[in-house]
Amino acid sequence: MRVRLALLGLTLSAAVASGCEINIGPAHVVQGSGSVKTESRAVHGFDAVELGGTGILVISQGDAEHLTISAEDNILPRLVSEVVNGRLELHPQSNTQLNSTQPIRYELAVKQLKEIRLAGTGDVQASSLDADTLDLSVAGSGSAGIGHLTAKTLNVTIAGSGSVSLAGQATRQNINIAGSGRYRAADLQSQQAKVDVSGSGDCALKVSDRLDVTVAGSGNVTYVGSPSVNQTILGSGRVSKAG
């Protein structure tokens, strides 16, 4: 028995070292080769994007739709990019465990975007984005950031320990945090905001006219500006003005 276990250990070590693919239980394990390759893929007909698993998604807005993926050469074929009901889904193949040694990077050009979803440990970045309404959700420990957002309505949902950082302007923002997530938007100008925090989440935002806040747990909400504030606190949470 010990000999068999030792042989199994040697086999796994050799597979890892050589960037091989092995099957352990129901999952197909792919160990990154270390050699990075870039591939262009045609995508069209979407106004939403979802990143699953790990990786970095960089979004730019313009007149065309295009996707470029950089990853290790034996991992790249295992990355799915498909449009389903108007949503571009980016994720590993099902029943596949990717042990990458180099970052997985998606560069996505969009015409318009109404929704961004992040599930897992990934990272979504955009230098600027213009949308009438934007729904942004983070589930897990991932992070999302937009350098300059222009929107009429912004809806943000954070479930878990993820984080969202935004700057720019939105007429109205609706923020929902469940868990220990963080929302950083003190540089995002808004007129009205509705914030719901359940757990130990932390929220910082800028609002000028009206702020409605509900905190259940030990969460904190800090605001910049002089809005009228309506607050409900259940637990040890706090609502305070910055400065």
Language-model segments: which ranges?
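Intrinsically disordered, low-complexity terminal regions
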Residues: M1-G243
